[in-house]
């Protein structure tokens, strides 16, 4: 295989979770925090997560105070505790084949590490490393620190790894480390976002099978 290590996003790359967990939990929180404001549509939410990213959606656009951010995270935790999202079809079988070829599987996510391990616990896959939300702002996505740590910990060159993500903050994080990127285009996105991602990144795949054929062959 050309690549020794996968650096995986989780939400809407490995699992179908924005429409079932992250968006409804955000709307539930904002309905209490901003009851007089029109709720974001799903496309608007995805758009803001794309640019400027979820953290800045909370701080710069919604202008949540620290207590409001704590409340939003509390509601989010209630949803993530209650719902385990499903993996996209063929995703786990792709990882199994990659692992059989001695590949390294890592996850860099804005979800919490415990939710990543929970998602994978009923599969045959145990990630070799997970960098989640609780690592601290200067050590978590979209800061390039997790990618640098993966390269260092596993003694990899940038070209030995490839990052797979559905949104710009993660893809940009990899590009800053000269790590190749794949756009996970199998989760629905507004046309403007899809067009931008297809134009600005190394590889763009509409299905998990296309990704598997590229990585494994």
Predicted features by range, described:
Residues 79-107, 113, 144:
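Short, acidic loop-to-helix structural element flanking the phosphoryl-transfer center
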Residues 1-4, 113-217:
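Asp-based, Mg2+/Mn2+-dependent phosphohydrolase catalytic module
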Residues 20-23, 51, 55, 92, ...:
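Alpha-helix N-cap/helix-start and coil->helix boundary motif
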Residues 35, 64, 103, 156, ...:
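Short glycine/serine/threonine/alanine-rich loop segments
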Residues 2-89, 100:
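N-terminal helical cap/lid subdomain that shapes the substrate entry/recognition surface
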Residues 39-42, 88, 92, 144, ...:
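Structural motif corresponding to alpha-helix initiation and N-cap regions
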């Amino acid at each position: 295989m050309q690549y020794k290590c996968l650096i995986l996003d989780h939400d809407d790359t490995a699992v179908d979770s924005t429409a079932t967990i992250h968006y409804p939990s955000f709307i539930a929180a904002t309905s209490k925090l901003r009851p007089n404001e029109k709720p974001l549509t799903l496309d608007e939410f995805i758009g803001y997560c794309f640019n400027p990213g979820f953290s800045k959606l909370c701080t710069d656009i919604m202008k949540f105070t620290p207590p409001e951010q704590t409340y939003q995270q509390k509601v989010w935790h209630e949803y993530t505790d209650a719902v385990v999202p499903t993996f996209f079809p063929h995703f786990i079988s792709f990882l199994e084949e990659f692992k059989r070829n001695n590949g390294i599987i890592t996850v860099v996510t804005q979800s919490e590490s415990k939710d990543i391990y929970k998602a994978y616990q009923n599969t045959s896959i145990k990630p070799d490393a997970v960098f989640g939300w609780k690592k601290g702002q200067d050590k978590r996505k979209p800061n390039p620190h997790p990618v640098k740590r993966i390269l260092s910990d596993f003694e990899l060159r940038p070209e030995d790894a490839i990052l797979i993500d559905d949104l710009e903050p993660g893809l940009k994080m990899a590009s800053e480390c000269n790590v190749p990127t794949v756009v996970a285009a199998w989760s629905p996105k507004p046309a403007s976002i899809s067009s931008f991602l297809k134009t600005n990144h190394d590889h763009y795949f509409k299905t998990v099978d296309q990704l598997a054929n590229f990585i494994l062959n």
